[in-house]
Amino acid sequence: MIFDFLFPNRCLDCNQLIDKNEIICEICKDNIHFSNHQFSEINSLKEKVSLLFPVENAFSLMLYEKESLAQKIIQQLKYNHREKIGKNLAEWTIEKLSFEDKKPDLIATVPLHPKKLKQRGYNQLHIF
């Protein structure tokens, strides 16, 4: 409780005070470019992944653009060991995905190189 008073939780983007379980405020969350792939038959991610191997569908939570809030969020997770971010990303993914009848056979992540694992000391995707 004293820790929360001395070090209140702030939005990663605008620095506004936010709930201790959040990573960004609602205003900044509205500014994130979430993808709208939702396992649609035609999407740009599916086209890119299909160049590497055959897939029926593909999904990404956010559009990762240089200098974007999505980039800031991912970098905080990867390099600053902010576990709360992984939990928030998992919650956002659940909110955004509606599997309906098409549950995925596989959820794949980008593998972490052993050298990076040694440098960071953890794999950020294990938090997610």
Tell me the role of every PLM-derived stretch:
Residues 1-128:
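Glycine-rich phosphate/pyrophosphate-handling loop used in enzymes and phosphotransfer proteins
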